Amino acid sequence: MKVILLRDVPKIGKKGEIKEVSDGYARNYLIPRGFAKEYTEGLERAIKHEKEIEKRKKEREREESEKILKELKKRTHVVKVKAGEGGKIFGAVTAATLAEEISKTTGLKLDKRWFKLDKPIKELGEYSLEVNLPGGVKDTIKIKVEREE
């Protein structure tokens, strides 16, 4: 029996593939558990259409991420924090703080998960920060942590 897989199934195939499996396996396991549906040309067209929509969505997401990255790379972003003598920050600068401060200055909507910090920043200075945007867009931006006057 021909089936179209609705999910990835180990040792059978990936989502959207058309596979030939035994009737019993299809009727007693794959179809009742929602892993597959019986093959029809209409269902195949619908799945191809869904894949095309998903592909366009990912492409649009990638383009949007590239625009955001281009805007982020234009300048060194300054984050002002309260600090004591010797450049020690009261508290720490986290990814959430960075996203919030950079959003204020650029007007972009940024997510804290896009900024990769191994550990929070606890001293004043300049840093290179890795940014992982949706759509697989990655690069580094420069930030400068300064004392608040």
Swiss-Prot record:
One of its GO terms (molecular function) is rRNA binding. GO terms for cellular component: ribonucleoprotein complex; ribosome. The keyword RNA-binding applies. Keywords: Ribonucleoprotein, Ribosomal protein, RNA-binding, rRNA-binding. SUPFAM superfamilies: L9 N-domain-like, Ribosomal protein L9 C-domain. InterPro entries: Ribosomal_bL9 (IPR000244), Ribosomal_bL9/RNase_H1_N (IPR009027), Ribosomal_bL9_bac/chp (IPR020594), Ribosomal_bL9_C (IPR020069), Ribosomal_bL9_C_sf (IPR036791), Ribosomal_bL9_N (IPR020070), Ribosomal_bL9_N_sf (IPR036935). One of its GO terms (biological process) is translation. The keyword RNA-binding applies. It holds the Pfam family Ribosomal_L9_C. Binds to the 23S rRNA. Belongs to the bacterial ribosomal protein bL9 family. This is Large ribosomal subunit protein bL9. It comes from Thermotoga petrophila (strain ATCC BAA-488 / DSM 13995 / JCM 10881 / RKU-1).
